[in-house]
């Protein structure tokens, strides 16, 4: 208690927060335990979602996993239950843009897990194309998957989250949802919408005790570039500098447990975000070199 008071006094004198000391390992503040939490995770069959699911089970959570690829979903569930046999894993296969699938996912949590504590909106789709080359189908698909489905699933989940234990919404945005990057204009616009929605919603649901975390990864070693909805230009963000899905997943777990509001889980992406805040003209010039 004396140590905490000492840090509080230091906070008053310097403006440093206790979280800054916690981030450096001096204090280990854990705001939320994930043990026995009932979690709905979308996009669970690959990439960050596939890496996140077993980590959540390891923390002691019960899961509803939603994804399009049924076989992959079953493989992930089998791996989880082999390692954590006491954890419940409910599978919902289908397209996140389908209203019936979203309803089925939320009801699976309510009926089979007894409620919902955490929603992780991880499902997404990508595209790399200049704005002028982006098709109408790409425009609509990027917002249907990355934004509209996320909002509508969150709306379905909120009444149950309000009754949950230490409730939380985790939204996956992107570094291109914080800074516009050439060839990611349409995809980035959808991710900007996710980041903005997360900030607004955080204020709106705080009175119910619901936290909102927005995650803004940089280039990550996933199938993103292999399954692009449209690809008419070379990716500006090089894949050889990507962080692993497992790293991003571990950072998400860390942020969830500590009640963070936003994380950028990659040094290069975090550097770009800071550079853009302090030297926006320079970043504008830099981006023209890739346009």
Question: Can you annotate each of these PLM segments?
Answer:
Residues 59-76:
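Conserved glycine-rich Rossmann-like NAD(P)H-binding loop of the short-chain dehydrogenase/reductase
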Residues 130-131, 135-140:
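Substrate-binding pocket helix/loop in short-chain dehydrogenase/reductase
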């Amino acid at each position: 208690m004396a140590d905490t008071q000492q840090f509080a006094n230091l906070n008053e004198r310097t403006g440093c927060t206790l979280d800054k000391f916690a981030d450096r390992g001096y204090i280990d503040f854990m705001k939320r335990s994930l043990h026995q939490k009932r979690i709905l995770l979308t996009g669970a069959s690959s990439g960050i979602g596939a890496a996140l699911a077993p980590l959540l089970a390891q923390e002691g959570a019960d899961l509803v996993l939603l994804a399009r690829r049924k076989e992959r979903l079953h493989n992930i569930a089998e791996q989880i239950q082999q390692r954590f046999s006491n954890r419940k894993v409910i599978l919902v296969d289908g397209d996140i843009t389908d209203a019936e699938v979203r309803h089925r996912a939320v009801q699976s949590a309510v009926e089979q897990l007894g409620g919902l504590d955490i929603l992780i909106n991880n499902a997404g789709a990508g595209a790399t194309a200049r704005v002028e080359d982006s098709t109408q189908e790409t425009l609509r698909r990027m917002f249907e998957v990355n934004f509209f489905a996320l909002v509508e699933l969150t709306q379905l989940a909120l009444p149950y989250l309000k009754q949950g234990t230490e409730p939380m919404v985790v939204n996956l945005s992107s570094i291109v949802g914080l800074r516009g990057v050439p060839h990611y204009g349409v995809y980035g616009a959808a991710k900007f919408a996710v980041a903005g929605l997360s900030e607004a919603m955080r204020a709106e649901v705080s009175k119910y005790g619901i936290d909102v975390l927005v995650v803004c990864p940089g280039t990550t070693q996933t199938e993103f570039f292999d399954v692009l909805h449209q690809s008419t230009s070379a990716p500006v963000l090089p894949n050889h500098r990507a962080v692993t899905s497992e790293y991003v997943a571990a950072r998400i777990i860390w942020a969830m447990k500590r009640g963070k509001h936003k994380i950028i889980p990659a040094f290069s992406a975090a550097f770009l975000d800071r550079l853009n805040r302090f030297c926006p003209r320079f970043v504008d010039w830099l981006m023209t070199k890739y346009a």
